[in-house]
């Protein structure tokens, strides 16, 4: 890939990974409109690593606090709000791990098409709108509980279907379960850490076993661009939803779905 292609795709990944608008729906557009070839495993590793580093850096204090409390709870068996939150995030990760290992190839074979991405972009956009309009209890992330965490984890597993959006599915579920917009987003972002880390490890393993030639310059640029874009995106997303809710992202998803449908019927 040339430098321009690396920057554009890394920007798309970084800006869409944590917004409820589906990164896969956006990454398919350059391929369809510009005829770009698949970026390959090494680039996937790079942009996913950049996004992961961004969320870890942004929530570094919360993550350190949770990790410290969680390790303390394992030793002393005394639970704090932070240790409970850590346990709930671990629990919420399990469905995605199970379905990811058991159905990844099936999903990649049968659901990775522009038709599926267009449909899920629209359907889950409407679900996000409905969830955002529901009357909520205004719960924060420390009030999730194990049952709600498991339901949100199942929603995260559903996001393995391209076009769904991991953040979109988890935020939608969290809103339906009574969390405030900000708490739903924070819980979704924190949930992304173990899943993204696991995915990065698996893709790296596939990369090393594939014998693919690695362009380290493109990889480094992809990490840097996706990190900066994702960090900025997280910061402003939390500000936007506190003032405007999810409506801008719902409208955007519906418009994007319409564009994908237009491409399908061209």
Curated annotation (Swiss-Prot):
**One Pfam family from the UniProt entry?**
BacA
One GO cellular-component annotation of the UniProt record comes to: plasma membrane
Q: How does it sit in the membrane?
A: Multi-pass membrane protein
Q: Which domain of life is it from?
A: Bacteria
Catalytic reactions of this protein:
di-trans,octa-cis-undecaprenyl diphosphate + H2O = di-trans,octa-cis-undecaprenyl phosphate + phosphate + H(+)
GO terms, molecular function: undecaprenyl-diphosphatase activity
- Which terms under GO biological process does the entry name? cell wall organization; peptidoglycan biosynthetic process; regulation of cell shape; response to antibiotic
Keyword Nucleotide-binding listed? no
Which keywords, in A-to-Z order, does the entry hold? Antibiotic resistance, Cell inner membrane, Cell membrane, Cell shape, Cell wall biogenesis/degradation, Hydrolase, Membrane, Peptidoglycan synthesis, Transmembrane, Transmembrane helix
According to its UniProt record, the EC number is 3.6.1.27
List localization entries.
Cell inner membrane
What function does this protein fulfil? Answer: Catalyzes the dephosphorylation of undecaprenyl diphosphate (UPP). Confers resistance to bacitracin.
The miscellaneous annotation reads: Bacitracin is thought to be involved in the inhibition of peptidoglycan synthesis by sequestering undecaprenyl diphosphate, thereby reducing the pool of lipid carrier available.
Database matches in NCBIfam families: PRK00281.2-4, undec_PP_bacA
- Which family is it part of? Belongs to the UppP family.
Q: What is this protein called?
A: Undecaprenyl-diphosphatase
Please give the organism: Shewanella pealeana (strain ATCC 700345 / ANG-SQ1)
